[in-house]
Amino acid sequence: MFLKLTLPPGLFRNGTAYQSAGRWYDANLVRFFEGQIRPMKGWDTGLTGTLSGTPRAAHAWKDNEGDSFAAFGTVTSLYAHDGTTLDDITPAAAVSILLEDGTDLDTEGSEALLQESGFDSGADSSTWTLDNFGELLVACNDHEQTIYEWQPRGGLDATAITNAPDAKAIFVTNERFIIALGADGDPRRVAWNDQENRTVWTATSTNQAGDLNLQTAGVAMCGGKVRSGGLIWTDTDLHLMRYQGFPDIYGIERVGNNCGIIGRHAFYIVDSVAYWMGQNGFWRYVGYVEPLACEISDDVFRNMNTTYRNKVWCQH
């Protein structure tokens, strides 16, 4: 006689296989839909062409004519895709990008060994942050640290934004400021340009450029926009950046402690709710920070190779 087994959706790995009796314990290439386990659909080629190096970031946006573009940052290059053609838009100047093994490669072919400290031992793997300022792509590599821009349809490579500071990461706010995190070599400095003027970064009494230092023991990692402002993650906590206008322009307050992010791409924002992977748990921001219950967290954090945690990617 056969008995029908009805197992709750999702995996349970917070304990041993014996402790997960009555639950799914292991799976691969499956999904849960309407409470039932289903196979993943097949893979389809998203674009033609070949990327040089492992992709570390992606961003999609539309230009002023409503046409879609996507950008991809790898450990060696920067690419743009217009729906048909994949273009290498890596800046023409020699761009040094630190690979995970510590080897520094530049576009002129020279090699050197660059010592940088990562989260643990060894070098922190190179990654990009990408956003759009209107129809312009804005890009920053956390090892090379120059802030670049790229004009769709321009036929040119990405170029450095004039007067912009060095940075570890960037994002664009709802008020159309480019935010530079870890600006000018200070891991806690947050700098922004004059509103709508991406080449003016020095504050005066007649513009809205400026900078602030995060009040934190951590270092700025990444940022993104929600309805209430811009969220800035460090490796120890979370901050909210609000537009105030003259004279301060922006104010920053800490909105979460001991909830720092594990990597620069370990978050996603949907409907102004932010979700992210922390150093030892999962979190979300809904106007306040709260932990997310996860039935596989023990397995994830126990077996993770933390040397490469900056490669963690969150997607929806």
Positions of PLM-derived features:
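N-terminal beta-propeller domains
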Residues: 1-111, 167-239
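Repeated scaffold domains used in trafficking and secretory/extracellular systems
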Residues: 52-63, 95-109, 115-132, 163-175, ...
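A short beta-strand motif characteristic of beta-propeller blades
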Residues: 43-49, 112-118, 156-162, 207-213, ...
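Hydrophobic or amphipathic alpha-helical targeting/insertion segments
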Residues: 132-161
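Short loop/turn segments that connect beta-strands within beta-propeller blades
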Residues: 82-84, 151-154, 243-246, 288
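Short glycine/acidic-enriched loop and turn motifs that connect beta-strands
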Residues: 77, 144-145, 184-186, 281-283
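Beta-sheet-dominated scaffold domains
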Residues: 216-316
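Beta-propeller fold detector
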Residues: 87-96, 158-163, 203-205, 250-255, ...
